[in-house]
Regions:
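Cysteine-dependent hydrolase recognition
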Residues: 1-140
Length: 140
């Protein structure tokens, strides 16, 4: 993981770096939470801030219609950032794009690893096995 991270920083993708300005938001439609917003409303606010900051596209994969396949296509095409808001477990997201460890290990986005903000319970619960956050870090 250390060598991968160093390589990622030292040798950026200069041939097709369009994915550096693309991202995704995966969200539930539950709430209200922060500032009285539902998760998908909160994600729309984050999306607009990123678009105002020169991102070219921020995919919206939200409940009730978001699917794992929709999220996988976006990730495999290349994303620099993923924002997630919803339920989580040690091995998965529960909403929007409800991916699990197996889905992450099947991705084909080698070299285009996103920065992930996961606002969910226990995705990083590393002390009881390979958790969801750790799976993302180990994925090739």
């Amino acid at each position: 993981m250390v060598n991968r991270t160093i390589s990622y920083e030292r040798y950026p993708d200069i041939d097709d770096g369009s994915w550096y300005i693309e991202g995704a938001g995966f969200a539930s439609n539950e709430g209200p939470g922060d500032d009285g917003e539902y998760d998908n409303e909160h994600m729309d606010i984050i999306r607009q801030k990123l678009l105002n900051y020169n991102y070219s596209d921020i995919e919206q994969v939200y409940d009730p219609s978001g699917t794992i396949a929709e999220g996988e296509v976006a990730i495999n095409d290349g994303l620099s950032i993923i924002n997630y808001t919803g339920h989580g477990s040690n091995g998965s997201w529960g909403n929007g794009c409800p991916m699990n460890n197996t889905n992450v290990n099947s991705l084909t986005n080698t070299g285009m690893w996103p920065w992930i903000w996961s606002v969910a319970c226990v995705n990083g619960e590393f002390h009881i096995g390979t958790c969801f956050a750790e799976t993302w870090l180990r994925a090739t």
